[in-house]
Amino acid sequence: MEIEAVEKEAIEKLSKISNVQELESFRIEFLGKKGKITGLMKNLKNLPPEERPAYGKRVNELREKIEKLFEEKRQQIQRILEQEKMEKMRIDVTVPGARRKLGHSHPVLKVMEEIERIFVSMGFDVVEGPEIETTWHNFDALNTPEWHPARDEHDSFYITDDLLLRTHTSPVQIRTMLERKPPIAIISPGKVYRRDYDATHLPMFHQVEGLHVDRDLSVAHLKFTLEEFARRMFGEGAKVRLRPSFFPFTEPSFEVDVYLSGYGWLEILGAGMVDPNVFLNVGYDPEEWTGYAFGMGVERIAMLKYGIADIREFVRNDVRFLSSY
């Protein structure tokens, strides 16, 4: 009979199937809407009425049988695929693991943290302040007159007439003196901004500025502090000298050089005794209190410490350069 022929063909083909694509082709050929088993049901109209029930029953039994065999084959193929996937995912624990490249601190950050540790060990507090400053905190309170070139738009990043990106961290000293009574000893690390960009200048760089206010402080205290810093930062052989200079907020003012073996004398920072006008601006009595201040560019210190010639290397994000320090 035709039913037995379809059954034999289906079972034979199903036994040879080995992948999902062949299984889908089988389903369409035998179990689909236009498949061979569905086609058997179309023969009902050609049979005598009394034979139709038995014939229909036989066709339905065949469909159920083939569907069961089909599902078993599908599960068998699925198990094989899962096993193959597991084999591919198998981990050989004897194979050496891949070495991860660990990140580390940027050389500028490393130097800034070292500067902080040195001054904290000498009794200074670390104080921070806003990077957007008023012109009063950034210039006026620091005895910087309106005609001073540092206040020009060509040198500073103004946001409004009264607000700008701070050009140094000295405003933190002003804010601290307004909030605290002397004596105080602080350093203020952070980002500062100036319109300058070349091999030795960046428009955004880092500074650490220091302030010590107490009774009877002198240039001798300032020099001792800077000598101790240089010795700890650059080694026991480092020497310090002070050259006369001018800053609006200190009087007297000095450029500070450090002597490094193999390099000679190199300028590293500016310093001086706090100008009495600055004390008056924050409500300190200059007849009672004296103080010294200093400020250094962290990138400058890092360049000297690591022998880096171009300051722009710090912001080029070259992993080969950064991983060397």
Swiss-Prot record:
Catalyses which reaction(s): tRNA(Phe) + L-phenylalanine + ATP = L-phenylalanyl-tRNA(Phe) + AMP + diphosphate + H(+)
Keywords from the UniProt entry: Aminoacyl-tRNA synthetase, ATP-binding, Cytoplasm, Ligase, Magnesium, Metal-binding, Nucleotide-binding, Protein biosynthesis
Cofactor: Mg(2+)
Major localization listed first in the record, in broad terms: cytoplasm
GO biological process: phenylalanyl-tRNA aminoacylation
InterPro entries with a match to the protein in the record: aa-tRNA-synth_II, aa-tRNA-synth_II/BPL/LPL, Phe-tRNA-synth_IIc_asu, Phe-tRNA_ligase_II_N, Phe_tRNA_ligase_alpha1_bac, Phenylalanyl-tRNA_Synthase, tRNA-bd_arm
Pfam families: Phe_tRNA-synt_N, tRNA-synt_2d
Keyword Membrane attached: no
Binding positions (Mg(2+)): 251
A single cellular component GO annotation: cytoplasm
Protein name: Phenylalanine--tRNA ligase alpha subunit
Organism name: Thermotoga maritima (strain ATCC 43589 / DSM 3109 / JCM 10099 / NBRC 100826 / MSB8)
Gene expressing this chain: pheS
